[in-house]
Amino acid sequence: TEKTFETIDRMPKYKGQLYNWYSTHTLKPYEPLFVSTVDNGNLLCSLWTLKEGCREMIAQPVFRSVAWQAIADHVDVLAELIAAEPESEELTAAIYDLKQRLEMLACGANDTFEAFATLEVDTAIFLEKLADSPAGNEIRWWAGELECRVKRSIASIADFAPWLRPEYSAVRDQLGSRVPRVSGLRLENSSKTYASMESAIRQLASHSDAPDALRSATRLLSDLERSAGIAQDLRDRLNRVADAAESLADDMDFSMFFDDKREMLAIGYDAGAGCISKWHYDLLPSEARSAAFGGIAQGSIPQKTWFQLGRFHGMQNRKPLLYSWSGTMFEYLMPCLWTKPHRNSLLERGARAAIRVQRKFAEEKGGIPWGVSECACNEYTQDGHYLYHAFGVPKLALHRDEYSNDVVIAPYATFLAMMLEPAAAVRNMENMKALGWLGTYGFYDAADFTDRRIGRGKQHEIVRTWMAHHQGMTFVAIANVLCDSAMQRRFHADSRVAAAERVLHEVPPRAIPAWEREIVAAFRPADSDSATDAAKPAA
């Protein structure tokens, strides 16, 4: 993160905003000098989240019980891989023994040095058995990472809580209740903790004549001084990253994207021509709402911008939905990586409706996995890259193009949906995995079910590539699901976000006005279901 900010500092900007394209060799922006509204909006939300995340790390315990759960999850992955190997009985028994030992240590250890040291020995025994086995590279990689993880845990304890090392057991026994609890050690109070420990050790040493005890006390005092320096350095680095994120976000001027006449955000700004683009973002279910919300929270654009974003409602199977431009999962759920989908709000119900329609779409296509969104497909551009397009579900989309009838499933869409429908999403992931869509770096970018792009006799073609932004969205969604809405919580911890949050609580309308039905009908003239049912209450 520090190196990323160092690079960003060297990149030319326009009114604090990053250009759309840069040379990775020179960091000079490419022509045309275009500044993207949505990309900078996503960056703004990410910067605020990062800032609060750094401050949260300073305030939270250095050692947490989730460390044991993380190692247990790691061992579970190893066990699953070993179970899939032929003739793996010996390794299966070895990993089972390791799991049993881990459970025993986690129950009674409270993250002590001794517990991790014991786990290190147990891991080494497992690695010895693995070395003599015909296990594949993937198992060996995960096993190597387990060893590194345990060693890093031991190093962290030595760095931040040196009194837990076995050579200081006699000092600990003599100090008794004055030994700090590791669960209470935080970077924000580490100086006080180390000073208190130092005072207790000096007092102990002043009442002892035993040479061994004095030597141990002297060494521990030296280690405490080192620990205080490490903690101070880490605290300072986290604060510097938080400050860098805040500074970069503060420099971003979103008023440059605002069209005063239409009271909307333009697609972007042409810095070469010195004007905003002629196209605008005018739909609420879109990536643009992150930029709109961020600009409103920042105070650089008026709140009315939010209410200028279109909300076009319809009905499918007698249930309400909110139309997007392309019908992608991305349009409904990507902003939820940061913003909370408040229960029964317009955005929450619109997102759930989109998931429902997407699942129904996959069911109608023969029960294939669901999750349609912008992604690569099994077609190549002139320069040999996979074609990228905003694939969507027709029943959710206002817009239709030559790709509207294509069926391309993007696994990252399921991870986005997991934030609202976790059980259904996990079942879908299991189906995708069973079909062979999981590769070395996670799920492949897409699976293409479009007839003209698949080989004879095949049901689909896997698009064997990974895209950084889809992987990033996947990781953030996982963090929200597994870590108590971590990214959403951090984003909303910013005072500006909290002040603007009320727009996210907007409720669905009780009925759809006639003018809105006319607009929808103009885009979707053949959709008789929507045309007939749209006049009914949406709530």
Regions found by a protein language model. Give the residues of each.
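Acidic, mature catalytic/reactive cores of soluble proteins
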Residues: T1-A539
